[in-house]
Amino acid sequence: MMMNSMIRQGWQQVLRRFSIPTSGDRLIVSNSTDQPIGLFGAFDTSLQTLSQVTNDPEVLKQKSNIPTHLDVASVLEASPRSFPWVFLTNSFCTFGGSIHAQNLQAFATAEFKSGFCYMNLLIPLSFDIIDAHADSFRGFVEQLPDTLGAYPSLSMVLNVMLHAATRFPEIVASPIPTIAFDAESLQFHVTDKRGVPGMWNILKACRVYELLSLAADGIGCEYMLYPVGAAPQYSFWKKSMDHFTSDRFVEFLAMQDLLASALEQDYATHDARDALLSALQNAGYTNVVARERRFPNGHDPSIVWLNLSEAPISEKLTELKRYLLVGHRSDDTADITHNVHQHVFEVLKTMSVQFSKTTNAYNRARFEVNHKVIWNAEYGRGPQQNAELEALVLFLNRQSLEIENILHRTTSPVVVTSWKPDVPPAAPEIKEEEPTHAIATPITEAPSHVTPVEVVNLPPTRSYWAETLVGILTAILGTVFAFLTRALIRAKRLRRKSTFPWVTLNSGDDDDDQSGGGGGGPQTPGGQPPVPHTRGTHQSRFSVQDIASDTSLLSVDLDEDTLSQYDETFQKIRRALFETSFADILQNSARWISTLEAMALADGNAPYTLLAQYLNGIEEAYTNFRNTGHISRATLSGFFALEDNLRAAGIAFGTTTPTQTIQNQFADSPARRWKTRFEQIACELGDASIKSLADLADIIDTERERGDLTQFDVLAASSISSLCRAVRIISDTTDPNAQLALVENATAMQNNINAILGTNVSIPFLSATRRLLITRRVQEAGAESRSGATPETVQQLADAELAKIVSEANMYNEMAASQRDIANATREATIREHVLSPVNALANVGMAAAFFRSGGLRSRAFNPAMPTMPGGPAAAGRPMFQAFRGRGHRLNR
């Protein structure tokens, strides 16, 4: 029997990534600390046992002809049954008991890296997969190593095999390699062509169905938690990451307090400099994280660790320490304190996300996500990791504001005596399995021999007459500057002309142009009369305060009708945002966004692009919420950030912003209340659950009369109410055949609700009723056998009934597998949304900010090739809206 070519290609990809390299040691079984815990012995030592077991010299002959290292391609081309491999089993030591003849049914396998030996279980199954399932099985094989990682527990491996047997029924009777067990290290190993390690035991399982029966019998047993490969550690750890063991980590808040207190000191004395240098050298801990030592717990948002050994903070700290040690010797005593403060400023800036592009701050989630490592004893941390990452972002933003306040704080002229760094000692999380000596010595205080420094009170030297004179001169100069700015800049307008340099400045007051005196207004260089003054046609600079009320645009091509239309649209948008009118936003968003993009082309300084992004995002989020009943925290955080930027640009919101309205509707969603109550009822037993379901149906019917339900609320109400009534009908029905049909229908409704609401609810009443009906049918079949039927007929009836029960069980397993696939897909989509939404929001804000900094289309009048606004001829082949249009922007250089 040949392996399907598609499956063979998938195995080649897996073997290329996870098999032992040619230079690797193939004779040792290692644990998580790379210490040998088992050896593969020579085949000669087991010849006597082999002869006693098989008494078949032909097997020995075939064994001796097989090379030591089989070619992987030849193994994958042929059926494993052509290689009757014999493992090194011990006749006196078996795990669970097994006959040795069954263990001879084996096959040639690849040699996988330590921790991935469970992949050997899938190699013999590959030969029994039908062509219709080849594509699905290939994807299953390729995804499994990344899904389980290295060293999963035995229960996880058995769950995977149960899932595979459900999806691919043809593999139930397929053979599997021997699974060895070491009673000393308490770990399993799926053997390959090297055999069983010496003195290891073997599991009583030679085929898939025997392995699944072991999974059913071992529920709750301790050995189900033993690792397949080694003890808990970080999977995918690289040698290049070993530097983290010696890196120095310190709590973020402790380092911030240390530097903040350092800014309040005078460093004219040697003892003060030594105290700060000693505090910096002793700050933090080493040996915080390693392959077998997990990063400290990150559930508390305030516990954030700073890696002092990574750039850029390590470079700034080195400069500060070097200056405290020797650099200050060439400076005057009066300048030393100022220079030390400047170095401390630079270190603080590296800790703030506002001043530094990269951050050295970590919590557990950021460390594991950034370095792509997985703690193999814990899985399914996706939602928890997302929450920890969001908490880290909020923490860094909050501390950045605090650092900014520290940097702007004026230093006190009073010198504090006997200063000691205020660094609270805090040890990282110590796990039970970690030795106590793994934690380094905590931060130490300043040396006790520091001599007190005298308190110096500086006398006041202020001159009030000089300050008054400076204030008067400043006011006069400010008035003159404002007058010149208005007279020489705001009154000038750009005018086009038909000759080089294509534009000219036409100065003068707009009111004088309309007065009618003095022999007429000025003429343009082209000899044409000046354009009559209309509101908003002159070029003006926008300020943050007047953007919301001033509709002037930086363009000379807009006529009065276009400007009036833009002004009317802009006022409608402001009114809809202020009143939080989602009806207007959903109805007019497409037209409003198009108008805002056109306005952004005319005025590069106004926040029209940012406003268009906000309207588009709000519309999509609100529509998605009404259809699915879900919106992520990351999406809401992005909208809150956009609203803050719009407020800074002069866009006013009402008491409740659109984002707050969506958040409140999500929190008060009727579907969420029904879902919570439905999950609570699913845990009840007996008649109480039936009564509770009926009460829930009545509550839903009452609340369905509300007119503010979303589409998702209506769908959830219909599904849950139908299931509640179906359960009531089942409890009132006495006909077994009718009950079975109703149970099937109710089970389908239950699976549908789990798919819609993202739950994993199983009503005990349905499962109990189903088991009761199946038991009655078996008993009835037995009763029929006692009515004079022949033994052959009785056996046929029993086989038919058993086959039907097995078919129903398989169908139920298929539905459960489909439900798990849907839940996994939903969870992956949620993870992608949590990770990508804040990144996209920040990228959009950055693009809009870069667009405004580039000047928008202020250089448009100097470039005749740029497209014109509506009402004028547009350049062929150029889109209407283009970001980064400014000629001086760095993206255009």
UniProtKB/Swiss-Prot annotation:
It holds the Pfam family Peptidase_C6. The viral RNA2 of bymoviruses is expressed as a single polyprotein which undergoes post-translational proteolytic processing resulting in the production of at least two individual proteins. The HC-pro cleaves its C-terminus autocatalytically (Potential). Keywords: Hydrolase, Protease, Thiol protease. The active site is at 117 (for helper component proteinase activity), 189 (for helper component proteinase activity). GO terms for biological process: proteolysis. PROSITE patterns: HC_PRO_CPD (PS51744). One of its GO terms (molecular function) is structural molecule activity. Its EC number is 3.4.22.45. It catalyses: Hydrolyzes a Gly-|-Gly bond at its own C-terminus, commonly in the sequence -Tyr-Xaa-Val-Gly-|-Gly, in the processing of the potyviral polyprotein. InterPro entries: HC-pro, HC_PRO_CPD_dom, HC_PRO_CPD_sf, TMV-like_coat, TMV-like_coat_sf. It is an enzyme of class 3 (hydrolase). This is Genome polyprotein 2. It comes from Barley mild mosaic virus (strain ASL).
